[in-house]
Amino acid sequence: MSMRYGGYRAVLQWALLLSLWLASGFALAQPVSTAQASANPQAGNRTVLVVGDSLSAAYGIAAHEGWVALTGQRLAARVPAWNLVNASISGETSAGGAARIVSEVVRVKPAVVVIELGANDGLRGLPLRDLRRNLARMVGASQSVGAKVLVIGMRLPPNYGQAYTDEFERGFCGIAQLLHASCLPFLLEPIARDRTAFQDDNLHPVASAQPALRDHVWPALLPLLD
């Protein structure tokens, strides 16, 4: 989690985006289920399960345009022995994910689980010990069925206070390292400094930005597909 995505100017740009995010009422606050398969499951194939919030649920764009669906398409083309199931829910917090993770892994029986949750926790200023506990529960439940896990993190603007933002950022890869899971520190790394990459709500990436997110996640996911 020590990686940085730019200098002071980049921090200000990201802070502006998230300030507008909060000012808009934070659209992720209304949970909407978007569970879907990104490819037609094939008998005998192994499955990647994605559990996330609206950043993974293709909020505001067609489902097939989101980075998760694009990853499913790439799997079908390059690693056809794998399926992808997207169980992301707009508005989800880590507590919501932790509450449903057992039923999801029992239902899907994944070989790999991608966890992209925590943004809502941080933007609402929720206790970070709860975020860490919920992440640990999700990782543990996934590993209990034999799945490998990729945790995808987020970052917060500096106006939340240095101590809170630093602890928030460290939590994702900290839990992953503790539980021997993989970690990608920041989902929005390749687009965070580009306001044109976001929808009018200044919060959700546009369709044209989704391939960059897929390409960012892919190198972290690929080693788990052995």
Residue map of PLM features:
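N-terminal non-cleavable signal-anchor helices
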Residues: 11-12, 18, 33, 62, ...
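Acidic-and-aromatic substrate-binding clefts and catalytic sites of carbohydrate-active enzymes
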Residues: 91-95
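Bacterial N-terminal signal peptides that target proteins for export
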Residues: 2-15
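Serine-esterase "nucleophile elbow" of acetyl-processing enzymes
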Residues: 30-90, 100-109
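Alpha-helical cap/lid subdomain in secreted, periplasmic
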Residues: 6, 74, 80, 98-226
